Amino acid sequence: MHLWYWVIGLTAFLFVLPWLPPKRRGALAGETSITFHPDRKTVHARFGETLLDAGLRQAIDLPYECRNGGCGVCKCTVLQGQVDPGLYQPSALSAAELAQGKVLLCCATALADVEIEYRAGQALATIQEYTARVARLERLAPDVMRVLLALPEGQGISFKAGQYINIILADGERRAFSFANAPHEPEFVELQIRLMPGGRFTTYVFEQMKEGDSLRFEGPIGDFTLRESSRPIVFVAGATGFAPVKSMVEDAFQRGLKREIYLYWGVRTLRDLYLPGLPEAWAREHPNFHFIPVLSEPTPADAWNGRTGLVHEAILEDFPELKEHEIYACGSVRMVEAIFPFLKKHGAEDGACFSDAFSVSARSLAFQPRQS
């Protein structure tokens, strides 16, 4: 009797299987196939595995950086089949691009067998994985922590000023942080980490991390680096966007760069200007360096006599014409996206504007209340 129940159940399952939604079929099948173009290589993805993870696991050199839906480097096109685009930052993939069949390799999962086209030749050839020890923790402000990471003896990491690393969490998720030290200071990897409300990793840094803890990371990543040019440089830093700028400025001094350098550091209040003495010292020691801090919401207690308002407004007051300058902006996605249209109206050229936008993990953002 039990055998008949089993036969009837199996027959019913086989009968309804073709009408199951692709996502359910994929879940039951356990694996889907992904064919990557232009190399026409086919790999198998486990249920719930992103296109990127499946490809990397099977030796496909795919382009990526942040691995959390924030940068857009791994953008690809779905040629055939269905995918779940997953959670990502709107700044990395627009609604129009999604409608055109674009998805992010690091977020999308296959719902059935799919064919994907990506831009070959963009894979990160030098990226490596490291295990480091937390050598020092120093609170620079109530919400900014300096973290110094030490690599095992005899091991180092070669990078360019302006690049960053991905901290690898226990579940494989990544969190991106810029090198704050210059390449000629290889003893420690310096990070400047800002506490994000509801941020899983940053909360861990501020509440649980201890000196001696181990951290896995991968790097170096990114191309937010100084270009070879004779143009004056304008750095625009928002909050901890100062970290990669610090690396780039100190590297420029080390290399004897004589170009004029202007640093506009935009924060809300005086306490957010967490290392003011450092750029002030640079200005005293290097005649070609100029430091302009800008507070958008100074408090009466700040007794602030310096520049106020929005950071791009301060730049345009000083430089009504920016055609001859290179602009390097680093900070939140909102800040970076807001300033460039204004600067370009005053002559800043597309080929001379570079940015590194800090994005909250798309997965973390999805579970946080929308800010009004």
Language model region names:
Residues 50, 57, 113-115, 164, ...:
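Residue-level marker of beta-strand positions
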Residues 173-180, 222-229, 365:
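Short, Lys/Arg- and Gly-enriched loop/turn segments at beta-strand edges
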Residues 93, 100-150:
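Fe-S ferredoxin-like electron-transfer domains
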Residues 126-214, 232, 267-269, 294-298:
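Ferredoxin-reductase
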Residues 1-108, 260, 267-372:
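Reductase modules of NAD(P)H-dependent flavoproteins
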Residues 79-82, 121, 170, 220:
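Short, surface-exposed secondary-structure boundary micro-motifs
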Residues 162, 241, 332:
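Short, conserved phosphate/pyrophosphate- and ester-handling motifs at nucleotide-, phospho-/glycolipid
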